[in-house]
Amino acid sequence: MESLSALYKNHIVTLQERTRDVLARFQMDALLIHSGELVNVFLDDHPYPFKVNPQFKAWVPVTQVPNCWLLVDGVNKPKLWFYLPVDYWHNVEPLPTAFWTEEVDVIALPKADGIGSQLPAARGNIGYIGPVPERALGLGIAADKINPKGVIDYLHYYRAYKTDYELACMREAQKSAVNGHRAAYEAFQSGMSEFDINQAYLTATGHRDTDVPYSNIVALNEHASVLHYTKLDHRAPAEMRSFLLDAGAEYNGYAADLTRTWAAHGDNDFAHLIKDVNDEQLALISTMKAGTRYVDYHIQFHQRIAKLLRKHQLVTDMSEEAMVENDLTGPFMPHGIGHPLGLQVHDVAGFMQDDTGTHLAAPSKYPYLRCTRIIEPRMVLTIEPGIYFIESLLAPWREGPFSKHFNWQKIDAMKPFGGIRIEDNVVVHENSIENMTRDLKLA
């Protein structure tokens, strides 16, 4: 495989091409991209954890340093002003010398407010991309050039197509996340609490809890029925029944997002249901190919859920087609089949049909689906079906004409296990699908 530096060099060529195109389209001279600033907690002198502007880390793998600036015009070498204060109160990141610094002019910026003296004097035709509009106004950027929608739509649309450098980074993020999942499973088997399982995960991935790309979901037993459960109980339950782990990792600013579900005992109905969800997830991935609308795979999985509900006698005396048509599968899988993945976990432009930002909403029947694009080579997506036992969603079905088809006794017996989700991260290629997660032998 090519070195990361060689891949990065080509990555910058691609970003420069996109920049030239978008600047020509909107008749602008350059883009000034801001890493962001620290924001203090209200009435306190303590800042929230810093999260970098994703459009900034698309160019450089600098994810922990506020007050940095990039100036790009698609022609000249990108300029990075790297915040390098004299400060004995806080750690200061050294001026970077890494695989990527040959492709960027790196300039020390000793004072956060010193950027104004470094920029070109004529700024009326420079666009600002960043989280602090007032800072841009103070630099003389025109109000209509601050986060201009057309520019951002264009940049977001093409972020769906990963460069080889980006794919290499995402494969590295997978490795960390897989290590974390294995450590967390061992912690679960040894009877640890959610809090301690999470600590084992972070240790194995080398992340702090502020470094992971999203808050880890570490859910034992019925907690797995809360889709984004992040509480982390300090005490292990008296009886271990199930464990759902939805946790990722980051490498050079690129995310992994994996989910696995395990049963404490391998011979009960819930364990058999996990195996079947896993098998259907893999079967769905085997049908994927470039040129198909992502929505089709979501709809297809509802048909697969109907098959499982029937096989496990959770819904009875109804055809699989009728289950889907009448949305009896809906309360069991209330979220989408997945989403784009990249610099952000729920990566941008999932609904964008072209580089002008044309929006195609999710079907009204499945409003929580996060992607309606036709999948194409170089896209990275999650495939994360699930079956859950969520009382607030099941309750309306306990009354009415369809209630008789639900095997309430069996459903209620499943509720203490919470639910199941299996999530892999896949890359679309011209004639194949690469499953980055399974390639690392995460069962």
UniProtKB/Swiss-Prot annotation:
Example of a GO MF term: metalloexopeptidase activity
One Gene Ontology CC term in the entry: cytosol
Residues reported in the UniProt entry to bind Mn(2+) 2: D246, D257, E423
E.C. designation(s): 3.4.13.9
Keywords: Dipeptidase, Hydrolase, Manganese, Metal-binding, Metalloprotease, Protease
Gene3D superfamilies attached to this UniProt entry: Creatinase/methionine aminopeptidase superfamily, Creatinase/prolidase N-terminal domain
Cofactor note: Binds 2 manganese ions per subunit.
Gene Ontology terms describing biological process: proteolysis
Descriptive protein name: Xaa-Pro dipeptidase
Organism listed in the record: Klebsiella pneumoniae (strain 342)
Gene that this sequence comes from: pepQ
